[in-house]
């Protein structure tokens, strides 16, 4: 494949753009080539003119800073480089290729098998445990932000734009996240910490098994009302083939009382996660 337009600083063309592989609210994601090393990367280029308020600008600053805080972890997309100009910010990251997001897989094929879900759950929790150890709270765990490397079924968490750094014992406030996956304490305006990520992860995993989220509504307001009611159900028609151990695990994460909700480390010790991989099936 031919790579043409160049990106670089100080008249040094460090990267060549090969193709666009994604597009979002603030810009594009491209596959780029670094001639000096022969490596390929994913480049998220953000158009600063598209940032409409202080929250957008904070997200712009957050992602590279938070990703740089985290040492290498196999289940987190790694940052490689940054090019900041007056008009754009380009974040160069590990290229996960070929890959598919959990969201795209749900749209194309529906539910996941339970062994597969348990294996992916373990990797998601390992990534969150690593983040929380460094004080990083993602705050937007959702299927779109979880990639699967199709070469080896490795899960990679990405997009830290909504994230925040919290010191030990610190909490924060503010409604951040995506309607189906946001924790109830966030919606209530309470102070919160890292356990919001565990709620979101639980909702993602429920959705992988059921093909639909546990709290549904036609509008954001209806979804928020369902989340705040917190009536977690496992309809027999949908969950007939899902183990009681898996349902117990989900109850530990999708727990309205954050003080009783599992941390990432506690979740990793749950029997359902401990047994993950015993009958694992390949991701297709």
From Swiss-Prot:
Constitutively active and not activated by phosphorylation. Expressed in rosette leaves, and to lower levels in flowers and roots. Barely detectable in siliques, cauline leaves and stems. The active site is at 140 (proton acceptor). It is an enzyme of class 2 (transferase). One of its GO terms (biological process) is response to light stimulus. ATP binds at residues 21-29, 44. Keywords: ATP-binding, Kinase, Nucleotide-binding, Pyruvate, Serine/threonine-protein kinase, Transferase. InterPro entries: CDPK_Ser/Thr_kinases, Kinase-like_dom_sf, Prot_kinase_dom, Protein_kinase_ATP_BS, Ser/Thr_kinase_AS. Residues 15-273 form the Protein kinase domain. Its EC number is 2.7.11.1. Disruption phenotype: Retarded growth and loss of light-induced phosphoenolpyruvate carboxylase phosphorylation, but little or no effect on the metabolic flux through the anaplerotic pathway. SMART domains: S_TKc. Pfam families: Pkinase (PF00069). GO terms for molecular function: ATP binding; protein serine kinase activity; protein serine/threonine kinase activity. It comes from the Eukaryota. Induction: Up-regulated by light, cycloheximide, phosphate starvation, carbon availability and high pH. Down-regulated by phosphate and phosphite. Not under circadian control and not affected by nitrogen supply. It catalyses: L-seryl-[protein] + ATP = O-phospho-L-seryl-[protein] + ADP + H(+); L-threonyl-[protein] + ATP = O-phospho-L-threonyl-[protein] + ADP + H(+). Calcium-independent kinase involved in light-dependent phosphoenolpyruvate carboxylase phosphorylation. Belongs to the protein kinase superfamily. Ser/Thr protein kinase family. Lacks the autoinhibitory region and EF hands found in calcium-dependent protein kinases. This is Phosphoenolpyruvate carboxylase kinase 1. It comes from Arabidopsis thaliana. The gene is PPCK1.
């Amino acid at each position: 494949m031919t790579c043409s337009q160049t990106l670089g600083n100080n008249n040094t063309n460090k990267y060549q753009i090969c193709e666009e592989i994604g597009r979002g609210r603030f810009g594009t994601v491209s596959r780029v080539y670094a001639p000096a090393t022969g490596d390929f990367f994913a480049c998220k280029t953000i158009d600063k003119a598209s940032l409409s308020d202080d929250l957008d600008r904070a997200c712009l600053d957050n992602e590279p800073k938070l990703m740089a805080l985290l040492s290498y972890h196999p289940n987190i997309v790694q940052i490689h480089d940054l090019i900041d100009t007056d008009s754009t910010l380009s974040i160069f990251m590990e290229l996960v290729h070929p890959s598919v997001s959990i969201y795209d897989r749900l749209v194309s094929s529906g539910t996941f098998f339970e062994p597969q879900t348990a294996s992916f759950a373990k990797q998601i929790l390992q990534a969150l445990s690593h983040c929380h150890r460094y004080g990083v709270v993602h705050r937007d765990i959702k299927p779109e932000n979880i990639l699967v490397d199709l070469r080896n079924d490795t899960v990679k968490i990405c997009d830290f734009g909504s994230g925040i750094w919290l010191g030990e014992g610190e909490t924060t406030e503010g409604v951040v996240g995506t309607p189906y996956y946001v924790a109830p304490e966030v919606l209530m305006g309470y102070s919160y910490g890292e356990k919001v990520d565990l709620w979101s992860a639980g909702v993602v995993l429920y959705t992988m098994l059921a093909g639909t989220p546990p709290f549904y509504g036609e509008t954001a307001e209806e979804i928020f009302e369902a989340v705040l009611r917190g009536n977690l159900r496992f309809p027999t028609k949908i969950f007939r083939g899902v183990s009681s151990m898996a349902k117990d695990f989900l109850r530990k994460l999708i727990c309205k009382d954050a003080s009783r909700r599992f941390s990432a480390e506690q979740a990793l010790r749950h029997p359902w996660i401990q047994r993950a991989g015993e009958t694992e099936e390949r991701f297709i």
